[in-house]
Amino acid sequence: MPSKSKAGPDTISSLRSVVPEIFDAAQRSATGHRKHAVALHSLQSKCHSVDVENLTGEMAFTQEFIRNLNKVLGIKKREPSADKIVKLVAIFVQVGHEIDAKAKAQRQKHKQKSGDADDVFADPAADDDEEEGDTVTSRFAESLIKYLLQGFQAKEKMTRVRCCQIVAMSVTNLGAIDEELYFELIRKLTERIRDKEASIRVHAAIALARLQSSDDGEASEVNEALLDLMQNDPSAEVRRAVLLNIEKNASTLPFVLERARDVDATNRKCVFVKVMAAIDYRLLSIEDRERLLVAGINDRDSGVKRACVRMVGESWLTFAGQNLLELTAALDVVDSPAAGKVMQALFAAYTEIPENLSFDNDLWETLTPEVAFVIRATLEFFAERHDSDQLDRHMPDGMRLAQMLEAMGAKLESETDDEVRADHEFVVHQLLLIARMSDFPDELGRRAMLTLMRKMLLVPEIPENNIEAVSDIIRKLSVSEQDFVRIMVEVISDVREPMPTEADGMPAERVRIESLLIGIKCLIIIKYLLQRCFDKLNDGSSIYALLTECIVPAVQSSETVLQEFGIECLALCCLLDRSLAVDNVVLFAQAVRQGAGELHAKGLAALLDLALMYGVADLAPALGAPDMLIKILRNELHSSDERTQATAAEGFARLLYAHRIAEPAPILEELLVLYYHPDTTSNDALRQCLAYFFPAFSYMSNENQVLMQQVAVPTVCRLGGVLKQQAGEGQAGATQSQVAHQVVTWSDPRILDAISVMNGTTTAMSSSGLRVAARMNSYAQLGVDALKKTFSATPNTRKVLVQMLNRLSLDDTTPVTHTQQLFVLVRTLAQQELITDMITRNAMVRFEATLLKLLDVENPDDVNLEAWIEEPEMESVFEFVSSLDEDGPDDEDELEGAESAGDDDDDEEDSVRVASDSDVSERHPSEEPVLAGLNLRSRLPASSAVPSRSPMKRARQERLEELTREIDELL
């Protein structure tokens, strides 16, 4: 309510002192903001009462308030005093509306008691204004918003930021404002969410999100603008602002769930901790829950994983009434691939949950999918923690477990409803997983379980995942590997025994299908048998019988599916016998060359596994040429099928890591090119594998890092054309400069040393001065290779290579010989005038200064080149300098696409070709390159003289003069 204290002209005149005092106090501390806001409102009420009819006092207060606010509009971000004033403005508007609301409630209460008719002194006009929301606070808010909207178009970035920030913080407390102003505000904010400054877009998005309303006609347009911003804005902070403030409803929720795969880890974390934690999981479809959990629990960022688990353990479990079974039912455990991971992560984060669980006899007798899943997950949790006490407390004995499995199997066989059968199959699988964790201490239980497992393998329609679990249980129950093989061979023989024939009265097609199904089942059992065998094959092994009777016929079969399983089983056999692998490598190569689909994929996997097991050198001779195996596998790196490409890349990564390739450099270079090539942008499996491989490989040993140093420059050069073309087409991806920076980082021996120290693997030998010098020797050679390539590279690649030199970070441990070689090459490059842009020239000057510092020389003229020429280590560099010819930049090393990447390079190349040999001899002394400083040619002996090369500037000038003469002749 308005203050009853006396107000007059003195109140207006005191504004210039009182308001600044309040602002000054507010910017010093944020603790008294509400007190300052109340003081401002009291002052505003006094000013309002000065001239109620013309609002003179009220306008004076508003003008003084804005005058003081102006002083913070241009202050930079994260300035505490300015941020406190912004907060004061928002609280002041909020306090005003709260006081107005209380006053309105009191008036209504008074009217209800006395009645409007009895109040003869009531002001009808004032009442109407109050009902329509026309109050001192609302008028002030409208004036403030109108003023701030003018700042939305300011040239100064910080003015736009502060105006949007104040609007964003005040917009929720605006109350009812003029409709025209409301739409104007939305229009202006919609413009600001396209501002080039991310901080402005953040505040504009927050304000726009808080103005969402399902009642106005522009709601859909606002939602569309915000959704587009949340999906496509390059700033993670802007996307996060929309994510946290956009209205959550049926139309926006799918887009909110997409942010669980945002490239920014903080945004992904916000989805789980702040957004979805506040939404009842029952409002989501099963598919949405599944996508959300899969994204969270499989996230590479540990913080996002913890956020996902926290959402389930604190929010979803609360919505489920702390009922774990109800929550498990919501996870759809029967069909969910992520439910197991989620439950294990939940138990690990909240250990009190599994520790307080108990499973009575009634629960075991009435197993549902949810109950069986929780029991299995609990036992698995204790098994992974090696908590034998808890495991023994919950684990049933072997005999009882066998009885439950047998009873559930009987239910499964008698059930006809597909949905119920799926539930029973799931329960059986969970019981098998539980049995796999049991130690079977009692002999009776062990025998009963072994008998039951053999029977289960004979069930015609047993799922493949159950075959795998049964194989594990039989292996655990067997006394040795030979005993396990014997049991499984007997089971396979029993499966094949009732092989159907036409004599049984079945149609030929039915006989073929039944025989095919039996053959597939036998091969699946053989696969899991071989995967659990580790002993080398001997002449008396029962596996040879399986090889002859099942595997070889399957490989030779006309049925593609049998060939696929046969190839896989044959590869597993070859892993147990080297001679068998050598004999069959041609078969696997044929599957890769001529096979399609799964046959091709399994043949490729077989070749890669065998190469990793025995080495390429042992297998290659069987193919007729030492490099034939590498050629076959290398062709798969360029397959049009992304899965094949990723498999080949992963296989080569393993081979390189295990040092199984005799000449690894070309393969490593190929993988680097593949990793950065635009054509593999959509191949997430390939890029994820290589993103882990390159740093792991480089920082594993000094030998690997030397290999990375050898291929760094060729990789950068090869990628120049395609990456430039990609940038020209507006596609997102790495630039050539980023590639150069990354390979230099992977080649840095000091990072390897730091990792060795961190892991505690540093030895006296590895840290010795001799070893450090050897590592820096190969690292400096990377710079030599880069400089040599600049003389024949395209202009764009040349710029990247020169800028790459400053990232080498050479120091006192760099061998002097390499420092001298780098200096000679840098001076020669400067003399050739191949570097034309100022940025690259400055980079070369900086690198030259680094070299002079390492050489302990202040002036380039002080370098004694005559002495260097006599050094044997410098011979190769001077020979290279003397071999430089008249050819222009050579882009043969670049991949396809360089021609269409742009015309700039072509122009420069053409200008180089225009100058003739005679032009070189006409050069005057004054035309020597500015950067040369030191005439290298004059100090070389005649045999090592560097042939002069026509500089670009002179070539362009000659070409320009020639064109001018032609134009004059035409005119």
Label each residue range with its predicted role:
Residues 1, 126, 191, 195-197, ...:
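Primarily eukaryotic
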Residues 108-127, 921, 927-930, 934, ...:
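Fungal intrinsically disordered, low-complexity polar regions
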Residues 793-797, 814-818, 935, 940, ...:
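Short amphipathic alpha-helical interaction segments
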Residues 2-81, 85-88, 284-550, 635-638, ...:
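Long internal repeat-built scaffold domains in very large eukaryotic proteins
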Residues 54-64, 73-264, 270, 274-282, ...:
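Alpha-solenoid helical repeat scaffolds
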Residues 893-933, 939, 956-971:
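Low-complexity, intrinsically disordered regulatory regions
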